[in-house]
Regions:
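Conserved lysine of the Walker
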Residues: 24
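Short glycine-rich anion-binding loops that position phosphate/pyrophosphate groups of nucleotides
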Residues: 89-92, 112-114, 161
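NTP-dependent small-molecule kinase module
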Residues: 2-9, 30, 34, 143-184
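Hydrophobic positions on the alpha1 helix immediately C-terminal to the Walker A/P-loop
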Residues: 27
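Hydrophobic anchor at the beta1->P-loop junction of P-loop NTPases
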Residues: 16
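ATP-dependent small-molecule kinase phosphotransfer cores
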Residues: 41-100, 125-126, 134, 138
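A glycine- and Lys/Arg-enriched "phosphate-lid" helix/loop adjacent to the NTP-binding pocket
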Residues: 103-146
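P-loop (Walker A) phosphate-binding loop of NTP-binding proteins
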Residues: 19
């Protein structure tokens, strides 16, 4: 029987946040399979609703339009998806989304700059047309890392680790028991 200390919060079983390349989608899907629950990637839900990839939404409609879609999608999924949810890396920039994440089982997949650059393919030589994506990644991480850390129920390092091992660690955290209680 659940007690107030061990009862899971209303909302998803777990919500993954972190920078691009952290492994939110990969690890989230593995954790969902281990827990026997469904998995949703908010960016995929946005793409399906918009009928085009996230990158095209940014280019054709602008970042402001994308962020509005992202905020509305995050609100709907946090309120109505009982499984595992992966939010896009920038979803935490929306104050409304941050409020909705309070008290949820938010798993921050902590990723260092070098790993994020490698996982997103930004360590490959780029034509001048693309500017300096590594510098942009550095600015993005500097801006977002404190927000991710502040929202986290649990922080899980991902550098130099296999997704399967990360998922096993997180699934164990989410099993019923004192360590799986709501965020303090």
């Amino acid at each position: 029987m659940s007690t107030p200390e061990t009862a899971p919060p209303a909302g998803p079983a777990a919500i993954f946040i972190g920078p691009p390349g952290a492994g939110k989608s990969t690890v989230g899907a593995l954790v969902a399979a281990m827990l026997g629950v469904s998995f949703l990637d908010a960016d995929t839900v946005i793409e399906e609703a918009a009928g085009k990839p996230v990158g095209d939404i940014f280019v054709e409609d602008g970042e402001e339009a994308f962020r509005a879609l992202e905020g509305a999608t995050a609100a709907r999924l946090i309120a109505g998806h009982p499984g595992v949810l992966a939010l896009g890396g920038g979803a935490i920039l929306d104050p409304g989304t941050r409020r909705l994440l309070a008290g949820q089982r938010v798993i921050y997949l902590e990723t260092g700059f070098a790993a994020a650059v490698h996982r997103t393919g930004l360590d490959a030589p780029r034509p001048l047309l693309f500017g300096n994506p590594r510098a942009r990644m550095k600015v993005l991480l500097d801006e977002r890392l404190p927000i991710y850390a502040g929202l986290a129920w649990r922080t899980v390092p991902t550098d130099d680790r296999e997704p399967k091992h990360i998922a096993e660690e997180i699934a164990a955290m989410l099993e019923p028991g004192p360590s799986a209680g709501p965020r303090p």
